[in-house]
UniProtKB/Swiss-Prot annotation:
Residues annotated as binding Mg(2+) 1: D196, E200
Xref: PANTHER family: KETOL-ACID REDUCTOISOMERASE, MITOCHONDRIAL
Gene: ilvC
Name used for this protein in its record: Ketol-acid reductoisomerase (NADP(+))
Major enzyme class: oxidoreductase
Active site, per annotation: H113
Amino acid sequence: MVNVSITTDYSRMLFMRNTKSTLKIAIIGYGSQGRAHALNLRDSGFDIIVGLRPGGATEAKAQADGFTVQSPDQAAKHADLVAVLTPDMVQKKLYEEVLAPNIKQGACLLFAHGLNVHYSLITPRSDLDVVLVAPKGPGALVRREYEIGRGVPCIYAVHQDLSSHAEQLALTYAGGLGGARANIIKTTFKEETETDLFGEQAVLCGGVSSLVQAGFETLVEAGYQPEIAYYEVLHELKLIVDLFYEGGITRMLEFVSETAQYGDYVSGPRVIDRSTKERMKAVLKDIQDGTFTKHWIAEYQAGLPNYKKYKQADLEHPIEKVGKQLRAKMVWLNSEKTNDTTHPMSSKVV
């Protein structure tokens, strides 16, 4: 895949300029990403409609932001591009019952995550362009960076190209979000979906949370104070992740002590070894062949019994009780919560 700089491609710049004045975009959903997309695109000169259930919790918020709010079916009827920015598990029903009967012929259907299309939960009409545009950051960050004249990198993909302009539409949309100010990378629905799920399951969410819990349990079972264990395996994780974020693993190693570096080199591979990688491959295989998605759909349709059980077990883990007590004394956290509503995974919560 290649990085794309649309600012250096005159034909794409011309397409974007000409499209702004004519393209009507319907944003379906007004959560973290939906609101950021709608505001940024409007500020970039596009005509925006927001599609929401009448009387829903976000309708008043969208209206307060100055948007025309219509029901999703009406918004789809009037739009040239329909951006589906709702949670994954409601998209199939939304598309089949609301969007498919109403979206006009030749319009563009846009997703911010490829799960439903990649696993054929949604089969878009053949008379539509179908694209993906995903900012690599939470909605609050997408909006904040745009407002100060910068942008969050975006990835994009094309699934169907009826008009022969689907790629340019995706790039135009990404540019309207501010992505062209940073970086835009071409991908596929398959690559975006499978890597996104793998990252969440094996590293960012599943991997890290299980590692932290295991580290906490190891220290407490060895007789160390739970409070000290919490600080060492969870609280200080932010310091390390911030360094990762700024400059990768090598930057982190530059800023920790030589003792910590040596411990990294000799003990890290004892915890995360070749067998870990083999289990990661098994997780990836379940994602690639659709096993995970099949199980997730069955779980959702059954009313989430196991999901609720897993969630309750996490809530009851001793690290949560200790953490709650310690965080109550961290007065700076309250001010951070007040001033910053950004959560890294909220890019999925729309």
